[in-house]
């Protein structure tokens, strides 16, 4: 995927303290080849803009009703409480009509943003970066799915901005190594050493991910790399599963290994996107 002069993003989170050193501005890129069953950012998965509906914001048919007047036929209905009901299966790919919603209950998730504009946003907090630790963290989705991420990182370094990335590792190896040239820190997910389980829970095999981590460590031995493992009940939470990951990582010069607890903070987003949470 490649936006010609920018990146497809779905969120920018400022003042983050958990995605790299110091105060970070986290830019979330859209599109991911994995479909993790526990994903807390389902709006990150599709590599194109999509419709999202926040029902709690809807002010109802009698007070508004503009969505039904502007949406394609069959997309909008109303419940007994007068709030809109969205038939996502009929929504198509053109969501321009949803700008009519005054409460922003209906919105487009994902927009292309020029690299310069992204970096200008990051530099709004430059005072924190210049006088202490902090900088830009690229997350997703899988940020390496977008080719322009290298240009973003390169231009960030030209502006003397500290850079980090959060990646699944499921990416083209050369693209990963090229991006690494402009990264101060890499957060790299290793979810399971069991390939059968990995495929069942994420939709992809783990061979590329494991090989890419080895290549990254060999090609960039000085790079600060933190491996993260989300510990998911029934998937990789057994002592045996975690020991396999630990044994694999012990052969590599990893800075540290973080085990992240399972949570359900993102479950509500699935309903907003017309999907079901699958874990």
Task: Go through the PLM ranges and name each one.
Residues 1-2, 6-8, 26-27, 75:
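N-terminal pre-core extensions flanking Radical SAM catalytic domains
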Residues 9-63, 83-92:
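N-terminal pre-triad scaffold of radical SAM enzymes
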Residues 20, 28, 50-57, 96-126, ...:
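N-terminal-biased segments
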Residues 37-44, 65-83, 94-111:
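Iron-sulfur cluster-binding cysteine motifs and their immediate structural context
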Residues 53-55, 107, 199-205, 274-279:
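Short glycine-enriched, charge-decorated loop/helix-capping segments at active-site entrances
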Residues 97-102, 191-194, 224-225, 271-273:
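Short, basic/glycine-rich phosphate-binding loops at helix/coil junctions
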Residues 116-266:
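Conserved AdoMet/S-adenosylmethionine-binding subsite of the radical SAM
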Residues 247, 255, 270-279:
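A structural motif corresponding to the C-terminal lobe/cap of the Radical SAM core domain
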